[in-house]
């Protein structure tokens, strides 16, 4: 039984990863007035099951924001958006790519989000540039009605200046920690794929994530969720320890200065309430 919001309860901000890996990515951000999805990976049935596990009603979703057009971020998009009549937003380049591959079919509203952002039921969503091998990738910050700020920052080969400035002061950040460098370099992936992942248009490593996490915590972020972990080239414990050790070495105290979590690839039941 879905009971995400108890009668009379004011939920200021909620966040959960519905899925987070190289196989599928989708995050929920919401409050008592409804919620949004950032990306729609898996398939529509699996996505709805993931929402059910975390107590989110698909009918409460007011919009879907797409970071880029890669399959692990959009595989449920067309069916889910059509079934629940949910509007979809993406950068101009990403939206054009979605149209080209037939993901936008005219059964739901699809529109461009520009640098000015958009208000969705009191949630102010704004994109920031990332660096990925796609048409026009981005991450998103979400300013909630009661003052909290959350962000999804994955699929980038490095921390862009715009990403850095956009995330200052976020209360919670889903931050990419895609791969362990040694596991990737010695793993089974072909050379060209390893080079793609390691490039400036690839993915953040555990070490990259750890370095940026220090900056975020020093600038006010209290909760960091490590996301988009590779099943083949990473391990949740290793990802967690890499960033946690870096924060500790910088003189920051876990559970006092920050809280750190590694998002599971799927079957997440953790709903963060701010």
List the predicted regions and their residue ranges.
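Conserved beta-strand hairpin/beta-sheet module of binuclear metal-dependent hydrolase folds
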Residues: 2-54, 138-154, 172
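Active-site environment of divalent metal-dependent phosphoester hydrolases
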Residues: 71-74, 95-97, 134-135, 159-161, ...
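Conserved catalytic scaffold of divalent metal-dependent phosphoesterases
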Residues: 116, 122-132, 143-148, 156-158, ...
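Metallo-beta-lactamase
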Residues: 92-140, 144-147
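Active-site metal-binding motif and surrounding structural segment of the metallo-beta-lactamase
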Residues: 45-90
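Metal-dependent catalytic neighborhoods of phosphoester/phosphodiester hydrolases
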Residues: 75-84, 100-101, 234-241
């Amino acid at each position: 039984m879905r009971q995400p919001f108890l009668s009379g309860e004011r939920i200021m901000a909620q966040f959960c990863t519905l899925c987070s890996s190289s196989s599928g990515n989708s995050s929920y951000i919401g409050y008592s007035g409804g919620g949004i999805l950032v990306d729609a990976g898996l398939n529509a049935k699996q996505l709805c099951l993931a929402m059910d596990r975390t107590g989110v009603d698909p009918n409460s979703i007011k919009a879907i924001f797409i970071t880029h057009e890669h399959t692990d971020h959009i595989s449920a998009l067309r069916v889910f958006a059509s079934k629940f009549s949910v509007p979809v937003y993406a950068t101009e380049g990403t939206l054009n790519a979605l149209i080209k591959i037939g993901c936008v079919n005219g059964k739901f509203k699809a529109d461009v989000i520009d640098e000015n952002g958009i208000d969705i039921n009191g949630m102010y969503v704004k994109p920031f540039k990332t660096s990925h091998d796609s048409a026009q990738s981005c991450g998103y910050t979400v300013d909630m009605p009661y003052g909290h700020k959350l962000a999804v920052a994955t699929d980038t080969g490095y921390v862009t200046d715009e990403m850095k400035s956009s995330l200052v002061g976020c209360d919670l950040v889903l931050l990419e920690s895609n791969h362990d460098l040694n596991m990737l370099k010695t793993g089974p992936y072909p050379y060209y794929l390893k080079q793609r992942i390691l490039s400036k248009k690839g993915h953040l490593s555990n070490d990259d994530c750890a370095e940026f996490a220090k900056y975020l915590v020093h600038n006010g972020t209290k909760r960091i969720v490590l996301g988009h972990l590779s099943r083949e080239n990473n391990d949740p414990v290793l990802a967690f320890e890499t960033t946690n050790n870096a924060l500790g070495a910088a003189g920051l105290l876990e559970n006092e200065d920050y809280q750190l979590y590694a998002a599971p690839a799927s079957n997440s039941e953790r709903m963060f309430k701010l």
